Amino acid sequence: MPKYYCDYCDTYLTHDSPSVRKTHCTGRKHRDNVKFYYQKWMEEQAQHLIDATTAAFKAGKITNNPFAGGPGGAPPKPAGVSIPPPNMGAPPRPGMPGMPYMPPLMNPMMGMRPPPIMNPMAMMGPPPPLGTIPGVRPGIMNGPK
């Protein structure tokens, strides 16, 4: 009977059946080993990217650093380009100074619809009857009788 070998755990299971594999794969040790394997793989990929970037920089393939700041720590602006003023009618962008007490806008949870936006005209109620003054109750127009 063939045995099942788990690469993550570096072990053989007693026999190759779906129930044994399922029990093994749901176990704490197996899940920890899988998590450790992918963490190690991500660290290796990050180190490879760092090494490749460093080698390219030393070889002169990267001439300037796009992340290096200009005077005062701000990145240099291209000639003739100016930053437009903030839109006063729109909500502030995240990180904009001036309103530090405002919480960030939250996205609705998946599957939930956002609350309906009421039309200001719909909140006023029905229009007054013809021949009446808006804002005055109909029984008060001519005074008490």
UniProtKB/Swiss-Prot annotation:
Q: Which domain of life is it from?
A: Eukaryota
One protein family per Pfam: zf-U1
| Cellular localisation | Nucleus
Q: Name one GO biological process term.
A: mRNA splicing, via spliceosome
The alphabetical list of record keywords is: Metal-binding, Nucleus, Ribonucleoprotein, RNA-binding, Zinc, Zinc-finger
Q: Which InterPro entries match?
A: Matrin/U1-C_Znf_C2H2 (IPR000690), Matrin/U1-like-C_Znf_C2H2 (IPR003604), U1-CZ_Znf_C2H2 (IPR013085), U1_snRNP-C (IPR017340), Znf_C2H2_sf (IPR036236)
Compositional bias segments (type: Pro residues):
73-91
Q: GO cellular component annotations, sorted alphabetically?
A: commitment complex; nucleus; small nuclear ribonucleoprotein complex; U1 snRNP; U2-type prespliceosome
Region Disordered, residue ranges = 67-91
UniProt lists the family membership as follows: Belongs to the U1 small nuclear ribonucleoprotein C family.
| Stated role | Component of the spliceosomal U1 snRNP, which is essential for recognition of the pre-mRNA 5' splice-site and the subsequent assembly of the spliceosome. U1-C is directly involved in initial 5' splice-site recognition for both constitutive and regulated alternative splicing. The interaction with the 5' splice-site seems to precede base-pairing between the pre-mRNA and the U1 snRNA. Stimulates commitment or early (E) complex formation by stabilizing the base pairing of the 5' end of the U1 snRNA and the 5' splice-site region. Regulates alternative splicing of a distinct group of target genes.
Q: What is the protein's name according to its record?
A: U1 small nuclear ribonucleoprotein C
